[in-house]
UniProtKB/Swiss-Prot annotation:
This is dCTP deaminase. It comes from Paraburkholderia phymatum (strain DSM 17167 / CIP 108236 / LMG 21445 / STM815) (Burkholderia phymatum). PANTHER family: DCTP DEAMINASE (PTHR42680:SF3). It catalyses: dCTP + H2O + H(+) = dUTP + NH4(+). DCTP binds at K112, S113, T114, Y115, A116, R117, T136, L137, E138, Q157, Y171, Q181.
Length: 189
């Protein structure tokens, strides 16, 4: 299993719509010159962006967090260019990009150091072979202060690994519960 380069990422995005929308190079500023947290193709990965729709965790309803029976009222929906995550809390978001992962590929996603150095952890599970959809992102604010997340800017890097052998059963074959997801998707069982 080997990591894939920028050339492979560009080719797969352009010829197979693996990433839409796609930035073939690193974008570090807006068109008017304002600096942003970078996104787009890097040497051996792709820096993904956070869309402007968020679900911010709240404990107003004083419920128990149960992944098998998650209470949707535990979140407050928010849409905007900046999301403020309360201290020691978290928020869900989704990527701007829609992914179509080839059958021979598995990805690993790691948070960008810009956020990690501020105590904001980005968690994303691997994108499995033949999974497609918007990626649901989880941001944990590990600090005792409110934390900002910027929409339409880079938040994490996706690394693509291609296997030397095709899997017997892909995510699509087994009817994965998050296949084709759009928007911020809550836990499913």
């Amino acid at each position: 299993m080997s990591i894939k380069s920028d050339k492979w990422i560009r080719r797969m995005a352009e010829e197979h719509n693996m990433i839409e929308p796609f930035a073939p190079n690193q974008v570090r500023a807006t068109e008017d010159g304002r600096k942003i947290v970078s996104y787009g193709t890097s040497s051996y990965g792709y820096d993904i962006r956070c869309a402007d729709e968020f679900k911010i965790f709240t404990n107003i309803n004083s419920t128990i967090v149960d992944p098998k029976n998650f209470d949707e009222k535990s979140f407050v929906d928010f849409k905007g260019d900046v999301c403020i995550i309360p201290p020691n809390s978290f928020a869900l978001a989704r990527t701007v990009e829609y992914f179509r992962i080839p059958r021979s590929v598995l990805t690993v996603c790691l948070g960008k150091s810009t956020y990690a150095r501020c105590g904001i952890i980005v968690n994303v599970t691997p994108f499995e072979p033949e999974w497609e959809g918007h990626v649901t992102l989880e941001f944990s604010n590990t600090t005792p202060l409110p934390a900002k997340i910027y929409a339409n800017e880079g938040v994490a890097q996706v690394l693509f690994f291609e296997s030397d052998e095709i899997c017997d059963v892909s995510y699509a074959d087994r009817g994965g519960k998050y296949q084709g997801q759009h928007g911020v998707t809550l836990p499913k069982t």
